[in-house]
């Protein structure tokens, strides 16, 4: 779908029902960046999410939630004014905009024209995965996974599977009046299997997802996740205790990146480097790790969980 469609969806979700038009956005932005504010932005967001859980061969739990809000940020030097409203009514939004800009007591507000940013290459389809299957089909999917897992090995004793989906709309207006929109779908199928042999019980896990619809969870995927979880659990039945103490750890791609993030990721964030409190401050372009170590964080992989068409500042 085109960026025009994405923007149309976000406007029809967050602006049109409340009668918010271009002039209202201009007034809000003018308040947020009122002189002498140096930087500011407005962040609209709605999210709906659901989950389904199967245990003991039955889908026993399901949940649904929705939330919305608008955040206003005004920055003056080292000071940041933040305010938010869970209501999208115009009066509530103007009050929040004024509250955010109150760090500049003598500021004068005005208006700023709003322009739309075009997305060259969306990395995922702006559709709602929650609507991609009806409720009975979601239950059937989990039941099919349960049956598949139990058919793989007689030592399978317990199966817990969950299906989760979310659909988020984001609209960001920066201090230059640039409006950026994004539709963010997400699904996840998670599986936990317990096997037992000669009184020993072990667990295996698997799953996957991304910025996709539930329809992507076809028979091939279900079979893959079932096999991975059962294989892992059976291997654990034969596994020996891991030795204690220090040891070399080899990290692969994907989820091990979480360890990299926790170890050094925060030190790479903008604020720490702007304030020169990071160990990496002033080292842009310099080698900061082993010469045989390269770390690539790619947020542009189509339909991947961590991919974004725009970041949370509209870039």
Language model features with spans:
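Active-site bordering "gate/hinge" segments
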Residues: 1-314
């Amino acid at each position: 779908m085109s960026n025009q469609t994405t923007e149309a969806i976000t406007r029809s979700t967050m602006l049109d029902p409340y009668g918010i038009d271009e002039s209202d956005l201009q007034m809000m932005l003018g308040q947020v960046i009122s002189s002498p504010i140096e930087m500011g932005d407005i962040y609209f967001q709605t999210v709906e999410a659901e989950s389904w859980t199967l245990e003991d061969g039955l889908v026993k739990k399901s949940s649904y939630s929705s939330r919305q809000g608008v955040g206003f940020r005004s920055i003056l030097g080292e000071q940041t004014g933040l305010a938010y409203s869970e209501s999208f009514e115009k009066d509530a939004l103007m009050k929040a905009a004024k509250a955010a800009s109150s760090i500049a007591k003598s500021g004068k507000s005005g208006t700023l024209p709003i322009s739309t940013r075009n997305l060259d290459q969306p990395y995922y389809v702006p559709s709602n995965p929650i609507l991609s299957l009806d409720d009975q089909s979601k239950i059937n999917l989990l039941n099919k996974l349960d049956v598949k897992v139990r058919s793989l090995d007689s030592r399978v004793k317990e199966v817990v599977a969950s299906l989760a989906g979310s659909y988020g709309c984001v609209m960001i207006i920066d201090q230059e009046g640039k409006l950026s929109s994004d539709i963010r779908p997400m699904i996840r199928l998670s599986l936990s299997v317990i096997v037992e042999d000669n009184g020993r019980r072990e667990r295996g896990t698997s799953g996957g997802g991304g910025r996709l619809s539930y329809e992507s969870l076809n028979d091939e995927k279900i079979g893959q996740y079932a096999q991975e979880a059962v294989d892992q659990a059976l291997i654990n039945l034969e596994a020996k205790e891991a030795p204690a103490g220090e040891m070399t750890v080899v990290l692969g791609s994907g989820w091990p990146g979480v360890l990299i993030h926790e170890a050094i990721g925060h030190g790479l964030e903008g604020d720490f480097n702007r304030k020169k409190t990071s160990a990496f401050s002033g080292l842009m372009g310099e080698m900061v790790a082993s010469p045989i170590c390269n770390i690539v964080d790619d947020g542009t992989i189509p339909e991947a969980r961590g991919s974004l068409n725009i970041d949370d500042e509209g870039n």
